[in-house]
From Swiss-Prot:
SUPFAM superfamilies: Rotavirus NSP2 fragment, C-terminal domain, Rotavirus NSP2 fragment, N-terminal domain. This is Non-structural protein 2. Its EC number is 3.6.4.-. One of its GO terms (molecular function) is metal ion binding. It comes from Rotavirus A (strain RVA/Human/Japan/KU/1995/G1P1A[8]). Homooctamer. Interacts with VP1; this interaction is weak. Interacts with NSP5; this interaction leads to up-regulation of NSP5 phosphorylation and formation of viral factories. Interacts with host DCP1A, DCP1B, DDX6, EDC4 and EIF2S1/eIF2-alpha; these interactions are probably part of the sequestration of some host SGs and PBs proteins in viral factories. GO terms for cellular component: host cell cytoplasm. Keywords: ATP-binding, Host cytoplasm, Host-virus interaction, Hydrolase, Magnesium, Metal-binding, Nucleotide-binding, RNA-binding. The lineage of its organism: Viruses, Riboviria, Orthornavirae, Duplornaviricota, Resentoviricetes. Pfam families: Rota_NS35_C, Rota_NS35_N. One of its GO terms (biological process) is viral genome replication. Residues 205-241 are annotated as: RNA-binding.
C-alpha cells in the first residue's frame, strides 16, 4: 500500500490540476536528502531530476534500512505512475480536492496488475483506453463503481460462470512489491456485472468453493468483490480491514462497506464485518472469527440476496 503522492505530483493549470509522474532518480535523491522536519510533508525539489515525493513517505520505498517498501528503481514504478497520471488527468481535480486525492492509500500490487493487463495484447484493456482508465479510477478510489471482471486487477482465471470469475493472484511474480513468501496463495472473485445474480449461479460458485477450495475462507474487504484466503491469514486480514474502516470513518471518507452475499461469505467473517459496521471494538469483533457458528441446513431455501447482517453479528457478545 502507498499514497498516491508516492507516484505523482500536481501542477496547477487554470482551475484544475495536471498530474506528473516522478522518475526513479528524483526519488533516489529525496531518499538521500536531509530535510527539515517542517518540510517533511512538502514535495521535494531534487534540482537535477525534478520533483520528488514528500520525505514523510520515505518508508514507502525499499532501501537498505527498509526492505518492505516499493522497489522504486524498477521500470514498473514509472509504468504505474504514468498510468495513475493518465487516469487522474482524464478527470477534473480542483484545489479543494487535490490534497484528499494525493493522500489516498492505494494497492500497489493492484496497480501493477493493471499495467500487466494493459501490456497483454490478448486482454481487453490493451484495446480499450476508456476501460483501462475506468479500471484505474476504480483501483485508486476515484470512482464509486465496484471492481467487476472487466475492470479487475487480473491474474490467472481458475473458474468462471455466467455471474462470477475467480482469479488466482500472481503477486509472487511482481516487480514493484512482490510477495516474498513462496507459500502465498490467494484468490479474488469478481462479479461479471454489477447486477442481481440468480441462485443457480451462486450455487455453482459455492459448489466450486466447497469442493476445490475447502481449505480457504471466503471473505470480503468491503469493496464489492470476494477474497479466498488461507484460514491462517484471516486474523491478519481482519486487522487490516478494521484499521482501514476506522481510518476512513475518522478522516470523513464515508465509504459503504459492502458485506456481499451471506451465502458465499464464510460465516465467521460475515459476523466479524457485521459487528464492525455496528461499531463494536476490534477485540469483540475478532472473537467472532474463532467461534463455532451454527450452519444453516440449506442456505438457498427461502433465501434471497438480501443481507441479514444484524442477526449474525451479535453472536457471542
Amino acid at each position: 500500500m502507498a499514497e498516491l503522492a508516492c507516484f505523482c505530483y500536481p501542477h496547477l493549470e487554470n482551475d484544475s490540476y495536471k498530474f506528473i509522474p516522478f522518475n526513479n532518480l528524483a526519488i533516489k535523491c529525496m531518499l538521500t536528502a536531509k530535510v527539515d522536519k517542517k518540510d517533511q510533508d512538502k514535495f521535494y525539489n531534487s534540482i537535477i531530476y525534478g520533483i520528488a515525493p514528500p520525505p514523510q513517505f520515505k518508508k514507502r520505498y525499499n532501501t537498505n534500512d527498509n526492505s518492505r517498501g516499493m522497489n522504486y528503481e524498477t521500470p514498473m514504478l514509472i509504468k504505474v505512475a504514468i498510468l495513475i497520471c493518465e487516469a487522474l488527468n482524464s478527470i477534473k481535480v480542483t484545489q479543494s480536492d487535490v490534497a484528499n486525492v494525493l493522500s489516498r492509500v492505494v494497492s500497489v500490487r493492484h496497480l501493477e496488475n493493471l499495467v500487466l493487463r494493459k501490456e497483454n495484447h490478448q486482454d481487453v484493456l490493451f484495446h480499450s483506453k476508456e476501460l483501462l482508465l475506468k479500471s484505474v479510477l476504480i483501483a485508486i478510489g476515484q470512482s464509486k463503481e465496484i471492481e467487476t471482471t472487466a475492470t479487475a486487477e487480473g491474474g490467472e482465471i481458475v473458474f468462471q460462470n455466467v455471474a462470477f470469475t475467480m482469479w488466482k493472484l500472481t503477486y509472487l511474480d511482481h516487480k514493484l512489491m512482490p510477495i516474498l513468501d513462496q507459500n502465498f496463495i490467494e484468490y479474488k472473485i469478481t462479479m461479471n456485472e454489477d447486477k442481481p445474480i440468480s441462485d443457480v449461479h451462486v450455487k455453482e460458485l459455492i459448489a466450486e468453493l466447497r469442493w476445490q477450495y475447502n481449505r480457504f475462507a471466503v471473505i470480503t474487504h468491503g469493496k464489492g468483490h470476494y477474497r479466498v484466503v488461507k484460514y491462517s491469514s484471516v486474523a491478519n486480514h481482519a486487522d487490516r480491514v478494521f484499521a482501514t474502516y476506522k481510518n476512513n470513518a475518522k478522516s470523513g471518507n464515508v465509504i459503504d462497506f459492502n458485506l456481499l452475499d451471506q451465502r458465499i461469505i464464510w460465516q465467521n467473517w460475515y459476523a466479524f464485518t457485521s459487528s464492525m459496521k455496528q461499531g463494536f471494538t476490534l477485540d469483540v469483533c475478532k472473537k467472532l472469527l474463532f467461534q463455532k457458528m451454527k450452519q444453516e441446513r440449506n442456505p438457498f431455501k427461502g433465501l434471497s440476496t438480501d443481507r441479514k447482517m444484524d442477526e449474525v453479528s451479535r453472536i457471542g457478545i
